[in-house]
Amino acid sequence: SNLINVSEGGPGEDGWSIPEDSSLIVWNLPYLSPPREGEPVLEAIEEASLSDLADGGWSDLLLGELGSATVRDDCLVVMLHRTDPPSPSSPESWKSEGWSSRLLASSRIADESLEVISYWRPGSGTPPIVLEECRSTMDEAEKISEPGWQRVLSLSQISGRGRRGSSWQSKTGDLACTWLIPSNVVEEYSPGLTQTAIGAVVSDALRCNVKWPNDILTDGGAKLGGVLLEGGTGSPRVKVGIGLNRKGGSLDGIRIAGWEDVLGPSRASEVFEMVDAAVASLFEELPSVSPITREELLRISWRGLSESLSQGTHVSRSGSSVRPVGLTEDGHLILYCESGVETVDEVESLSWVA
């Protein structure tokens, strides 16, 4: 009889609060659009159970309650959202506040899409290793032996690196970060799909575009950051490096962008929280949440690329126009060209113009 206690009430009501040390919160959110002024309303109990609130909805109200509650660091929140047409209770509010999320189930009923989404704090609230300066966050991450969601960020990186051994030039105030993810993740999904999915969720968090396979660009096509995967044979974990510029400018005669161009003045810690939540949403391992599926990774990756392409990005190869039409299961780009449908796995053969 002491295992379950039931109390009536909810967020926003006097005297109601989230119980201390809560580890699981489940809510079938009311998702009917709130009635406009002059429209008929339901009975009081039906209105409370079925209709959402305006301006952020019940979801934002719960998010605010959690900000002052003393729940466990590993508390998991599971909610049912109406995502199409969009409900006031939007998953985006949780992402912007640094919560990771993963789709658990979805269903299309008539003209509505319902999704069950889980939310948690990356690393169960364990902070990253923060360095004022280092040679490379990839090298610093190599020194970490502790299990769990481990990441390193540095506000100044002296000797960063990019794809194929190229250098990644950073200025003081930029963001250089490395995450450690289990190597079996990359083995299961392939490096190509892994880095494209990461590029897609990071670009979404920063309100940018992703260029296949892993560059973060502004709407105007200027590069803001990039993603790099490294992992030795037999290593239990793979390093995911992400570099982001704070300010735009010019590098070797090429225009670059910074997060302040799209987000406005923002602290590096704030940007890291958004990116950390995005990466954890894909690959953090939780005992109570199923791993992300290959199909979901493909959907996320192609959605990110499609948003960029839908804005008029022109892609060519060897001077001839081509049209990206999809991704293979390994994250390779499928192109429609003059000779038919082809697959490419090397970005160097393509030219992207926003």
Predicted feature locations:
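S-adenosyl-L-methionine
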Residues: 1-19, 24
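Short loop/edge segments at beta-strand edges and connector loops
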Residues: 6-10, 105, 132, 210-212
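Glycine-rich phosphate-binding loop signature in dinucleotide/nucleotide-binding domains
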Residues: 16-20, 71-72, 145-147
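Mobile active-site "lid"/loop adjacent to the S-adenosyl-L-methionine
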Residues: 29-61
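Short "lid" loop at the C-terminus of a central beta-strand within the Rossmann-like core
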Residues: 31-32, 82-86
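Long, positively charged amphipathic alpha-helical accessory segments at protein N-termini or as interdomain linkers
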Residues: 59-74, 79-83, 184-210, 219-354
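A SAM-dependent methyltransferase catalytic signature shared across enzymes that methylate proteins
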Residues: 67-71, 78, 89-104
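N-terminal lobe of the biotin/lipoate ligase/transferase fold
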Residues: 95-196
